């Protein structure tokens, strides 16, 4: 490590010293002590200003400073001569052979003496380390005369080695590995406090103290300790995470499997259940009677609005079947009317048109539903004296909510002499109608909340409390088949047609599997025996078919559904196609 002092342009004084780490390692190697990690040298010392002094005074001051530290006497015998001559090579040759350990006892003695001697006035400016920027003023009571002259002339630039001071610091205070990565931090030891108190007498006290405070903030990294609230919050979060995984790690199913099907009591038939429910006394009977009387007062108003070209739809909580029945018995005794129970599982738009043509005394059949609708329209246009009232319970039922069914019923209601009054119960029933259908129906909406039980409307639905007959209604059949693929529906349609063709055959036990496979293969519905068996398994799971073996061991297929329902299903399929 090299420190350079410029005295003049023609005279150059250079002093070369060995670094702190090399001196310390040399001493500890001799004494067998532990080695300390190398640190960066802190040598460059600056004062605020440089004032030119006479040449003789500069030389004397420099020599006194060097003699005070006793560096020249220890580090090399011929260094003073090289300094006088201004030679840099001679001094370096005498310094670097120091590593040959020519004077080990003398170096150990020097180290112990320097550890006891008071420190000199030094200003550190650690420019070599980018992490540390700090200036620390230090002084001692035991200054020599040369040191006092140096303090008076603070504008002068000095290049002094801090090896003795750094060595003493390492011997007194061992280096601790703090969380901060800086290699130097401001110390709060007694020595530094004494130095700071003595330096307060200096004229630059305020400026230097501000620098120290600013640089201390840069050097010492703040240690943020966790507050109790943050610690509790972190522990609470960790507990929540642990509880989440504990709750989801269990493979045990907590859902109960106790259903009504596992009850040991025998299931009731429909008549027994109806008798038991009829014995239950209704609550709020007086209020319900008064509410129904308010609705009955609207009957004449409804009749007037129907003749004015409007159709009436009733909505609200509770069954409206009894209300429409009272309207029929009160106002339509002398009129032609048709009551359609939309909640019936076997109802379809075809059956609605058949009822209308039956009232009009038509004999014959129609090729399609559209032909039948066209005939009804022409009949009412030809005879203006014809009047027909249609009462439809549950117009939004599963069998009538289709787009084609609503379109046909809307065209019927748009005729001049057909009057429609219907009820809806589903919350989203108005979504069935777009603007075109709304214009056909020409509705007037009436809220008729009755709070009555849906006894008749739900009587055809499957219940866990009632024994099942085993027959599949048309609504369930359509619902199941709509969830299947087109090929699956085609396979089932072939089986229906074959069964309807043989309905008059008393010895018919079903369709042979091999014959059925051949028909499906010819219709390009299946390509292998396994494909057909997989599809039949799905039908069997939905209870659409039943298989049995004959006396010859051949497998036969049969649909356990009434032939009338199968006929309605085929008609419904043809209408949709």
Curated annotation (Swiss-Prot):
One of its GO terms (cellular component) is nuclear origin of replication recognition complex. Residues 144-158 have a biased composition (Basic and acidic residues). Residues 189-204 have a biased composition (Acidic residues). The modification Phosphoserine is found at residues 249, 281. One of its GO terms (molecular function) is DNA replication origin binding. The modification Phosphothreonine is found at residues 117, 227. Its main location: nucleus. It comes from the Eukaryota. Keywords: DNA replication, Nucleus, Phosphoprotein. Involved in LRWD1-binding repeats lie at residues 1-100. One of its GO terms (biological process) is DNA replication. Component of ORC, a complex composed of at least 6 subunits: ORC1, ORC2, ORC3, ORC4, ORC5 and ORC6. ORC is regulated in a cell-cycle dependent manner. It is sequentially assembled at the exit from anaphase of mitosis and disassembled as cells enter S phase. Interacts with DBF4. Interacts with MCM10. Interacts with LRWD1 throughout the cell cycle; this interaction, which occurs only with non-ubiquitinated form of LRWD1, prevents LRWD1 ubiquitination and hence stabilizes the protein. Interacts with POLQ. This is Origin recognition complex subunit 2. It comes from Bos taurus (Bovine). The gene is ORC2.
């Amino acid at each position: 490590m090299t420190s350079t002092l410029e005295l003049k342009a023609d005279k150059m004084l250079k002093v070369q010293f060995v670094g702190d780490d090399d001196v310390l390692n040399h001493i500890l190697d001799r004494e067998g002590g532990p080695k300390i990690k190398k640190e960066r040298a802190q040598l460059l010392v600056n004062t605020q200003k440089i004032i030119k002094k006479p040449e003789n005074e500069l030389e004397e001051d420099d020599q006194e400073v060097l003699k005070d530290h006793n560096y020249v006497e220890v580090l090399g015998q011929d260094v003073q001569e090289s300094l006088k001559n201004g030679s840099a090579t001679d001094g370096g040759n005498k310094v670097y052979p120091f590593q040959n350990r020519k004077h080990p006892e003398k170096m150990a003695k020097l180290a112990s003496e320097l550890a006891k001697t008071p420190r000199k006035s030094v200003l550190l400016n650690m420019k070599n380390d980018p992490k540390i920027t700090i200036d620390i003023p230090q002084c001692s009571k035991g200054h020599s005369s040369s040191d006092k002259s140096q303090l008076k002339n603070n504008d002068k630039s000095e290049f002094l080695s801090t090896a003795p001071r750094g060595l003493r610091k390492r011997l007194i205070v061992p280096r601790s590995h703090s969380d901060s990565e800086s290699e130097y931090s401001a110390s709060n030891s007694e020595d530094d406090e004494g130095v700071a108190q003595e330096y307060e007498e200096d004229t630059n006290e305020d400026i230097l103290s501000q620098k120290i405070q600013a640089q201390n903030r840069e050097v010492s990294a703040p240690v943020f300790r966790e507050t109790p609230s943050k610690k509790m919050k972190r522990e609470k979060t960790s507990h929540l995470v642990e509880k989440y995984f504990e709750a989801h790690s269990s493979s045990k199913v907590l859902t109960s499997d106790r259903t009504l099907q596992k009850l040991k009591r025998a299931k009731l038939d429909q008549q027994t259940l109806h008798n038991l429910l009829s014995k239950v006394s209704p609550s709020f009977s007086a209020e319900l009677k008064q509410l129904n009387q308010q609705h009955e007062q609207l009957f004449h108003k409804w009749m007037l609005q129907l003749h004015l070209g409007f159709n009436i739809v009733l909505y609200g909580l509770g069954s409206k079947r009894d209300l429409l029945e009272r309207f029929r018995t009160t106002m339509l005794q002398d009129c032609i009317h048709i009551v359609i129970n939309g909640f019936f599982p076997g109802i379809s738009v075809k059956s609605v048109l058949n009822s209308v043509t039956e009232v009009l005394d038509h004999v014959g059949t129609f090729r399609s539903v559209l032909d039948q609708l066209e005939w009804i329209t022409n009949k009412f246009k030809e005879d203006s004296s014809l009047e027909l009232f249609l009462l439809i319970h549950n117009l939004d039922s599963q069998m009538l909510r289709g787009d084609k069914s609503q379109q046909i019923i809307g065209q019927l209601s748009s005729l001049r002499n057909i009057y429609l009054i219907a009820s809806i119960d589903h919350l989203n029933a108005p979504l069935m109608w777009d603007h075109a259908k709304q214009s056909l129906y020409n509705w007037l909406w009436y809220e008729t909340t009755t709070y009555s039980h849906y006894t008749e409307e739900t009587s055809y639905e499957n219940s866990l409390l009632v024994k099942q007959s085993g027959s599949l209604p048309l609504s369930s059949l359509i619902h199941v088949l709509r969830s299947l693929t087109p090929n699956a529906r085609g396979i089932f349609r072939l089986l229906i047609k074959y069964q309807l063709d043989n309905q008059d055959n008393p010895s018919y036990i079903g369709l042979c599997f091999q014959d059925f496979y051949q028909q499906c293969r010819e219709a390009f519905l299946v390509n292998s025996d396994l494909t057909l068996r997989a599809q039949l398994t799905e039908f069997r799971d939905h209870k659409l078919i039943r298989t049995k073996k004959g006396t010859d061991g051949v497998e036969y297929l049969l649909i356990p559904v009434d032939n009338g329902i199968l006929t309605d299903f085929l008609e419904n399929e043809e209408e949709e196609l």
